[in-house]
Regions:
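Hydrophobic/small residue at the entry helix of a nucleotide-binding pocket
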Residues: 13-16
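Rossmann-fold cofactor-recognition segment
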Residues: 51-69
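Conserved Rossmann-fold cofactor-binding substructure of NAD(P)-dependent oxidoreductases
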Residues: 65-81, 93
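N-terminal glycine-rich "phosphate-gripper" loop used for MgATP/nucleotide binding
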Residues: 67, 84-95, 105
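Rossmann-fold NAD(P)-binding glycine/threonine-rich loop
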Residues: 103, 112-144
């Protein structure tokens, strides 16, 4: 079964992630991009089409989302039948997106540790401060210099 993907964040990393997902859309299902500015998501989608990044015809859609709004994120995940959420938005949204994934059963992939806006530059262990508290409840994958759970 193909897995529908929601990419949260439409900056530089979101652009790269969306193109990589498009290059593997034979294995993935629908690809959705969401950010506070859906026009940025649409620009990424347009660049995917312009470069011919899709392996085969597929669903690519842009959505407006305030990822700090757990209810809105949860609703979008359910509405689109999302299986995998790739969070490449601001580090301040990690816990809200993770909570929405826990509540919906979606797998959560991330590229950065969570930062609390009131506690920037916290002391290590950074992952243990936030995300690792939930590692037994869901699938959490960190992409980058460190990775936690290996369950997928």
């Amino acid at each position: 079964m193909k897995k529908n993907v929601l990419i949260i964040g439409a900056g530089g990393v979101g652009h790269v992630v969306a193109h990589k997902c498009a290059q593997h859309n034979r294995k993935l299902g629908a690809i959705h991009l969401a950010s506070r500015n859906p026009a940025k998501c649409q620009q990424i989608i347009d660049s995917i089409h312009a470069r011919g990044s899709l392996q085969e015809p597929g669903i690519l859609e842009a959505h407006a989302l305030d990822a700090l709004d757990i209810d809105a994120t949860r609703a979008l995940i359910r509405q689109l039948d999302i299986h995998i959420v790739i969070n490449v938005g601001s580090a301040f949204v990690n816990m809200a997106v993770l909570r929405a994934c826990l509540d919906t059963g979606a797998a959560y992939l991330d590229t950065a540790i969570h930062e609390d806006p009131a506690k920037i530059c916290e002391q290590p262990p950074w992952y243990a401060n936030y995300e690792w508290k939930y590692r037994d409840e869901c699938q959490i994958i960190k992409i980058g210099r460190a990775s936690c759970r290996e369950r997928v």
